[in-house]
Amino acid sequence: MQQDKVNLLGLNQKAIEDFFISIGEKKFHARQVFKWIHKKGVIDFDAMTDLGKNLRHKLKEKAQITIPKVVFSKASKDGTHKWLIDVGGSAVETVFIPEEGRGTLCVSSQVGCTLNCSFCSTGKQGFNRNLSAAEVIAQLWIAARTLSKTDGEHDFTVTNIVMMGMGEPLMNFENVVPAMDIMMDDLAYGLSRRKVTLSTSGVVPRIYDLLEQSGVSLAVSLHAPNDMLRNEIVPINKKYNIDELLEACKLYAQNGPHKHITFEYTLMEEVNDNLSDAEELVALLKSREVPAKINLIPFNPYPGTPYKKPSNNRIHRFKEFLQHNGFVTTVRKTRGDDIDAACGQLAGDVMDKTNRKQRYLKKLGDTNAN
């Protein structure tokens, strides 16, 4: 029986070195190939000109570099770019957001999501599977290779990564961490820990593991100032409550790259956007002594949701109260809404688990017909 070829795309530097040793080759050859793949974007062994002919032949027998197919891509009028990527018959989305002086890539970690937060469109798809490390890093590989550096108006260089796409990254820890290792490797994309941010809904044990094994920047999807409300809208809170979550956050802030935690708070009208909610949030964070920045996210409605986006006045009032009480507070701009790329819309054309494959196949058929 022929052994399956190893996909080198998802191997971090140590793993690819171990693979080369296992086939009787030297570590420095592994580093050469690693650099070819990620720094230069080359996936054809024959094009790796500093490798000997015998080594290239051996690699073709024992390894492969497989990039997922891009089903389609869309560019927004504001410069935002979205890709729908085929991951073995299912699809995930990746979004690039250009801003002045930076370009942020929002990366998915799962097909669907297990956590079923009540306001999240991705959660309504149900959960299919975790992405492999290769499928995670492929999103950056594709973006880095297909974006032009500039169109005269927008800068299209990826400078920051946010693990905030489809899925809960800490529920796919074993694949997400090696992929982030590649993102931060100087032989690959060379991003610093400050430039790679993982967002979690609060898988508390894995927050401690993340600090020990990776130490990237941490963002926490809080969305509520008390357990009663958070139990309702972020169900994982029933397993790991706010006290446990903030205890982990405090330790992470003390040892992480930013010395603070970014708390994401999706504002939903008359659900969690009242002044009393802001007061409770301030009291909560001050009492737990967690160094915090707060990122307010106006809710983006999607078909079938009972929630509404607050008025600008309510958003401004909430922000002003937090700032007045000493918290650095930002309001996330709505970006890419004309291509369904804004936060909360990452389900896009693959809205629910039942119809995901049919929708994907239809999109693939439409693409091939053009």
Swiss-Prot record:
It is found in: Cytoplasm. It comes from the Bacteria. Binds 1 [4Fe-4S] cluster. The cluster is coordinated with 3 cysteines and an exchangeable S-adenosyl-L-methionine. Residues 99-337 form the Radical SAM core domain. CDD domains: Radical_SAM. Reaction proceeds by a ping-pong mechanism involving intermediate methylation of a conserved cysteine residue. This is Dual-specificity RNA methyltransferase RlmN. It comes from Francisella tularensis subsp. mediasiatica (strain FSC147). The lineage of its organism: Bacteria, Pseudomonadati, Pseudomonadota, Gammaproteobacteria, Thiotrichales. The gene is rlmN.
